[in-house]
């Protein structure tokens, strides 16, 4: 309890501090009101000049603190003149919390959009760009259009970054003082910027300050979603079909175990025996069978943990993911690690080819790259530990402008779902008779449709808002607070949209929110409740539960069922028990804890690739931004030669076989016969290096003489292609390592430590391969020039669920590389995808 008291006291102290700062802002109201419009814009210019004259970010931060009261007061005056709205003291407090890099928790209807204008304006003055991030393009467009009036009045520019924009339009949007965008588009633009070949193809500036609307949705609910830019991999889909056939043959408990609490499924020993017989294996868990085990486990998940119309829907032969937090389908998105293909096999639709990852990043790692990160939402306090541990953000609960008048009634618990739904319908009919608007919240599409059928039988007119008819969302939400309105919504009672009460509804008790089941996250329940009682309106909320609900089943409702039976309670009699409500909340906390642990575990694994990604992207950017790459190329060639001598020339042996070393030199650096054994025989390693290096230098200068004006361009192209090719292969290898690493725990090994160690070794090997590739292609290519060849564009790699059109840019002439020698480990030119030595070079 001491810890909780500290949190509560801490919030009170913070509110007191913010309140004092807000008073300073309000005290400047009169001073600002006498300024002309032009004088207001001149103030903005003066702030900008003062800040932008200082290049040191920490010194800029001090200036921002000094000018905060005046800048916030200026925005208040601007809002008054442009919108005829003056931000309340609580909105100023919320704005200061956001400026401090924290999360401002503000209830629904408290005006988060207007709150964000003050810290956005203040931080945009530094000229480094502020990103205002929303969950979808509709909100980004509407907010940017609305708020641009205010920012333009104050003298700042506003950009809107959409998926459909060209490269030039995107760059323009990012160069504005304030940029509105979705989280997806930002992540993909970052990845694409790190796949370009020329600096002028980049669209983003360095990541400075981001304000995330609905921050819990993006940083918690979407944290595990990787953004992936991918190309198609040439892998057969037949194993998905075989694994699906196998999974459907299995019997629960005999062949596999399903854990309700963790939603995990795994084969029993008997199931493993069946797998060995079907796939003709000696030992299913042998490491060489990782691919088969992975496909079997994926088929088990698809068949026994994911439900159609709950986790996904099938529309026109396509599997669409349903977002469990919003109830919306997510067209274009696919489950990763082969799970989407496994569901396609399960549903008998066409199995799409697996894709090969070219670049990827999680939201956790993307957003941690900003110098400063802040957010706002109506529900964040339950996840404060995660925000603090992973993002170093504190949650500040901002008081409401008017007292909350919503009545949150105790849960009603029934024995069966039938009893629960009958009671829900009776409650709806009763309230509907007097005209009170009702919002019914469900956790699944099928539940919303079941309740809809029950209400139709009772003659109650209503709207259904779920993944199947989400296109009417704005229209349905806009009328949900009108007299007599009944709305059934699946986890999606419109984040970012307010339900406003119609005329005469206040007298009827306001909006009644009825939850038909507890969600596994308390935040989603709080969001549903928060639809009612906005800005001091009257309202009420109540949850109806049954012992057959998924959350209750997962966390043991047998004891309660027996207790209710002993009390002689029938299906129509609910209990209203604080003990049961506490048990439900305890179950939710356990699920939230499990989910937090899973996100932390993913972050630990992702940390390995994050560090490697930073090295590779840093190397690429250095190549792109430097005038010449010759120094780097020569360093790579020398390093490759030095390694080869250390490996092949063992000075401790009496007789050294120089043939393997000469073969390597001919394969990578020089042509056949250019190095003879008698030139290096009997020499020490240093002398051998000098002898061979002299010949390599000559070959390098000869290549340079072929295209003196374009040799820099040639080197840059070879470097980027070598890095990109090896990096995409490395991502694929790391993905395979990660999928199979859990098997190590059976051998009493630490999977994470093994992943870190082996990932490090794989990265070192990749860097060696890059240096060898660069050496070979620089020294052994026949070079001609073709002015008509266009640059490689990042758009060649199609985003997994987002892609952007590139602008039409003037193309620099590029060298054409014709390799006159095929190494044994090179891809075979016949196009089989195999190595040359395993194909035509046998």
From Swiss-Prot:
PANTHER family in the cross-refs: CHLOROPLAST PROTEIN-TRANSPORTING ATPASE (PTHR30612:SF0), SECA INNER MEMBRANE COMPONENT OF SEC PROTEIN SECRETION SYSTEM (PTHR30612)
Classification via PROSITE patterns: SECA (PS01312), SECA_MOTOR_DEAD (PS51196)
EC number: 7.4.2.8
Keyword ATP-binding: yes
Alphabetized UniProt keyword annotations: ATP-binding, Cell membrane, Cytoplasm, Membrane, Metal-binding, Nucleotide-binding, Protein transport, Translocase, Translocation, Transport, Zinc
Family per record: Belongs to the SecA family.
Originating species: Staphylococcus carnosus (strain TM300)
Class in the EC hierarchy, top level: translocase
Protein name: Protein translocase subunit SecA
Subcellular location: Cell membrane; Cytoplasm
Start-end of Basic and acidic residues biased regions: 798-824
NCBIfam families on file: PRK09200.1, PRK12904.1, secA
């Amino acid at each position: 309890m001491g810890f909780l008291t500290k949190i509560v006291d801490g919030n009170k102290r913070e509110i007191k501090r913010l309140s004092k700062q807000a008073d300073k802002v309000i005290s400047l109201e009169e001073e600002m009101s006498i300024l002309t419009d032009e004088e207001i814009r001149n103030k903005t210019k003066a702030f900008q000049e003062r800040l932008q004259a200082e290049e040191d970010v920490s010194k800029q931060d001090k200036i921002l603190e000094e000018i905060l009261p005046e800048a916030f007061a200026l925005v208040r005056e601007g809002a008054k003149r442009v919108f005829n709205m003056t931000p309340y003291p609580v909105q100023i407090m919320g704005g200061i919390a956001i400026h401090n890099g924290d999360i401002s928790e503000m209830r629904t209807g408290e005006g988060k959009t207007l709150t964000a204008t003050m810290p956005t304006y203040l931080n945009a003055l530094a000229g480094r760009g502020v990103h205002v991030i929303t969950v979808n393009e509709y909100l980004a467009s509407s907010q940017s259009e609305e708020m641009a009036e205010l920012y333009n009045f104050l003298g700042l520019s506003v950009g809107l970054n959409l998926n459909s924009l060209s490269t030039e339009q995107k760059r323009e949007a990012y160069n504005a003082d304030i940029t509105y965008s979705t989280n997806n588009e930002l992540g993909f633009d970052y990845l694409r910027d790190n796949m370009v070949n020329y600096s002028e193809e980049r669209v983003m500036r360095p990541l400075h300050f981001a304000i995330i609307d609905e921050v819990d949705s993006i940083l918690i609910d979407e944290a595990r979603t990787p953004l992936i830019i991918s190309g198609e991999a040439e892998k057969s889909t037949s194993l998905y079909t075989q694994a699906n056939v196998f999974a459907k043959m299995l019997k629960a408990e005999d062949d596999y175990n399903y854990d309700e609490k963790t939603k995990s499924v795994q084969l029993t020993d008997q199931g493993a025996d069946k797998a060995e017989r079907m796939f003709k294996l000696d030992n299913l868990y042998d490491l060489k069978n990782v691919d088969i085990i992975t496909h079997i486990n994926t088929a088990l998940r698809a068949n026994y943990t994911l439900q159609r119309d709950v986790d996904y829907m099938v529309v026109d032969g396509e599997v669409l993911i349903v977002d469990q937090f919003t109830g919306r389908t997510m067209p274009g998105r696919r489950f990763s690690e082969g799970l989407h293909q496994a569901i396609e096999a399960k549903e008998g639709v066409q199995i799409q080819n697996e894709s090969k990852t070219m670049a990827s990043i999680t939201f956790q790692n993307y957003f941690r790259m900003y110098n400063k990160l802040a957010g706002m939402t109506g529900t964040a306090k339950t996840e404060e530990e995660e925000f603090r541990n992973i993002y170093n953000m504190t949650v500040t609960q901002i008081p409401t402008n008017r007292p909350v008048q919503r009545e949150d009634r105790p849960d009603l618990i029934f024995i069966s779902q039938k009893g629960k739904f009958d009671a829900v319908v009776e409650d709806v009919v009763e309230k509907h008779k007097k005209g009170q608007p009702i919002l019914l919240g469900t956790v699944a599409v099928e539940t919303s449709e079941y309740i809809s059928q029950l209400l139709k039988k009772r003659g109650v007119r209503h709207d259904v808002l779920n993944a199947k008819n989400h296109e009417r969302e704005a229209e349905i939400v806009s009328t949900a607070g009108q007299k007599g309105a009944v709305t059934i919504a699946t986890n999606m009672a419109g984040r970012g949209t307010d339900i406003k009460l119609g005329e005469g509804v206040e007298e009827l008790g306001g909006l009644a929110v009825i939850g038909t089941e507890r969600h596994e996250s308390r935040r989603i329940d709080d969001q549903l409740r928060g639809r009612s009682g906005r800005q001091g309106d009257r309202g009420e909320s109540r949850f109806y539960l049954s012992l057959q609900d998924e959350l209750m089943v997962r966390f043991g409702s047998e004891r309660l069922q027996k207790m209710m039976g002993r009390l002689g309670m029938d299906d129509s009699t609910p209990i209203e028990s604080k003990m049961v409500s506490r048990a439900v909340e305890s179950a939710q906390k356990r699920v939230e804890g499990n989910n937090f642990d899973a996100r932390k575990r993913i972050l630990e694994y992702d940390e390995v690739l994050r560090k490697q990604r930073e090295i590779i992207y840093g190397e690429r950017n250095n190549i792109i931004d430097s005038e010449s790459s010759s120094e780097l190329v020569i360093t790579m060639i020398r390093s490759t030669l030095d390694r080869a001598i250390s490996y092949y020339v063992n000075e401790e042996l009496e007789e050294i076989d120089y043939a393997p070393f000469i073969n390597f030199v001919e394969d990578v650096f020089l042509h056949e016969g250019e190095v003879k054994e008698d030139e290096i025989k009997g020499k020490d390693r240093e002398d051998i290096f000098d002898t061979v290096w002299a010949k390599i230098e000559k070959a390098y200068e000869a290549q340079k003489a072929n295209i003196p004006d374009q040799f820099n361009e040639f080197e840059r192209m070879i470097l980027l292609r070598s890095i990109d090719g090896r990096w995409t292969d490395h991502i694929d290898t790391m993905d395979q390592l990660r999928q199979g690493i859990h098997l190590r725990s059976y051998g009493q090994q630490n999977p994470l430590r093994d992943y870190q160690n082996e990932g490090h070794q794989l990265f070192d090997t990749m860097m060696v391969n890059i240096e060898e590739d660069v050496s070979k292609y620089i020294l052994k290519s026949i070079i001609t020039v073709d002015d008509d060849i266009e640059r490689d564009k990042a758009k060649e790699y199609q985003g997994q669920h987002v892609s952007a059109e590139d602008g039409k840019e003037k193309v620099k002439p590029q060298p054409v590389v014709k390799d006159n020698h095929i190494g044994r480990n090179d891809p075979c030119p016949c196009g089989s995808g195999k190595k040359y030595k395993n194909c035509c070079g046998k």
